[in-house]
Amino acid sequence: MQVVNSLRSAKQRHPDCQLVKRKGRLYVICKSNPRFKAVQGRKKRR
């Protein structure tokens, strides 16, 4: 899963990509091609 600043280009990679909001984070999910998954707003680990 990629962590990106903007999901605009991530949701346009495939026609089946959907934008979903879960627990305050934005996710792009794609059931037909799971390598296009992405997330915005993930907390950084130290």
Curated annotation (Swiss-Prot):
InterPro entries: Ribosomal_bL36, Ribosomal_bL36_sp, Ribosomal_L36_bact
Keywords, comma-separated and alphabetical: Ribonucleoprotein, Ribosomal protein
Gene Ontology MF: a single term: structural constituent of ribosome
Residue pairs linked by disulfide bridges in the UniProt entry: none
Domain of life of the organism encoding this protein: Bacteria
Cellular component terms per the entry's GO annotation: ribonucleoprotein complex; ribosome
Pfam families the record matches: Ribosomal_L36 (PF00444)
GO BP: translation
Family: Belongs to the bacterial ribosomal protein bL36 family.
NCBIfam families from the UniProt entry: PRK00831.1 (NF002021), rpmJ_bact (TIGR01022)
Name of the protein described by the UniProt record: Large ribosomal subunit protein bL36
